[in-house]
Curated annotation (Swiss-Prot):
Secreted mono- and diacylglycerol lipase involved in plant virulence. Has a substrate preference for p-nitrophenyl esters with a carbon chain length of C10 (p-nitrophenyl caprate). It comes from Gibberella zeae (strain ATCC MYA-4620 / CBS 123657 / FGSC 9075 / NRRL 31084 / PH-1). Belongs to the AB hydrolase superfamily. Lipase family. Class 3 subfamily. This is Secreted mono- and diacylglycerol lipase 3. One of its GO terms (molecular function) is metal ion binding. Its EC number is 3.1.1.-. GO terms for cellular component: extracellular region. SUPFAM superfamilies: alpha/beta-Hydrolases. PROSITE patterns: LIPASE_SER.
Length: 317
């Protein structure tokens, strides 16, 4: 009887040993890429930033780099909307790791039309397609830039959602494109909210887009899904001025510029974040704009209307 009990115990012990070995092998097979780990100083995984910086950078490149089928990293360009001149370029990508990415181009410094959006500074009633509540107001130039492309963007996005129905959407942009990205996110939520989900909105070097009522409404619609990113002493996110305009909640500050020293500041206009800087729009003793930190290295990828690589490159900086 004791011999039989010993056999049972040995069999159980053998089963447990084999099971533990199998579990260990599975655990060891899990990728340990550092970019996929959550950085406690960022609201989203680092890889989401590194990849979407490249998504945006490619919108600054010429027509050849913005032909559907172009690939970089694990992203494939599906749709390129707008000519980057009279209509700000918006690209729609599919990423194997992140899903659908919608990225908007910043100001084209060689385009009078593109630059004109930056000075249409009157707050106006938002377009009904944004789905904002009464009392919200938005910067006229950003809404004008968004509106010119939205019909074509929404049609292309509808096709993309049909092609990848289980994928979520990340919306992103830089500078003027960052402002457009907030409006694009609202329009996507309003038009496609019943068939798709916005995962994140990441706005690089974002100017303020709307009034405090706009910022509050945006926070309500996208709780915990948004962050702006400010590089060093970039002054663009400090405009247009408060109290008429206000950022939604959440801002990452890369400080010093182009470094791996960054921190997330929750809430609207956190006084410990980029709002604590004294901005310098011009080079000392001149009226020449200092665009320095507006372009540069964001989370290991390079981006800027004149400085970034073409075609875009994911990481490596």
């Amino acid at each position: 009887m004791m011999f039989a009990d010993d056999l049972v115990r040995m069999a159980v012990l053998r089963f447990i040993t084999v099971a533990l070995a199998a579990i260990t092998n599975v655990a060891n097979a899990v990728p340990t890429d550092a970019t996929k780990r959550q950085d406690s100083n960022l609201p989203f995984p680092l890889a989401h930033f590194t990849n979407t910086v490249a998504s945006v950078q490619n919108t600054y490149c010429g027509p050849t780099a913005n032909t559907p089928g172009v690939k970089f990293g694990d992203q494939t360009l599906l749709h390129a909307i707008g000519d980057g001149d009279t209509v700000q370029r918006t690209n729609i990508y599919h990423s194997e790791s992140l899903g659908i990415i919608v990225a908007s181009q910043g100001t084209n410094l060689s385009s009078i039309v593109s630059q004109s959006h930056n000075i249409q500074a009157i707050p106006i009633i938002p377009d009904a397609r944004l789905g904002l509540p009464f009392g919200s107001m938005v910067f006229a130039g950003w809404q004008n830039a968004w509106s010119k492309g939205w019909t074509d963007v929404s049609a292309a996005l509808a096709d993309t959602i049909k092609q990848f129905p289980n994928d979520q959407i990340i919306v992103t942009g830089h500078s003027q494109g960052a402002a457009i990205s907030l409006l694009t996110a609202l329009a996507i939520q309003n038009q496609f909210g019943n068939v798709s989900t916005i995962r994140e909105i990441i706005a690089y070097g974002p100017p303020r887009v709307g009034t405090p009522a706009f910022a509050d409404a945006f926070d309500t619609i996208f709780p915990g899904k948004y962050t702006g990113v400010v590089n060093g002493d970039d002054w663009v996110p400090s405009l247009p001025s408060q109290p008429i305009y206000r950022h939604p909640s959440g801002m990452v500050w890369i400080n010093p510029a182009n470094s791996t020293s960054w921190k997330y500041y929750p809430g609207q206009e956190n006084p410990d974040g980029p709002d604590s800087r004294v901005i310098q729009m011009f080079y000392p003793g001149t009226l020449q704009f200092n665009w320095g930190d507006h372009q540069g290295i964001y989370m290991h990828s390079s981006m800027g209307t004149t400085q970034g690589p073409c075609p875009a490159q994911v990481g490596g900086f």
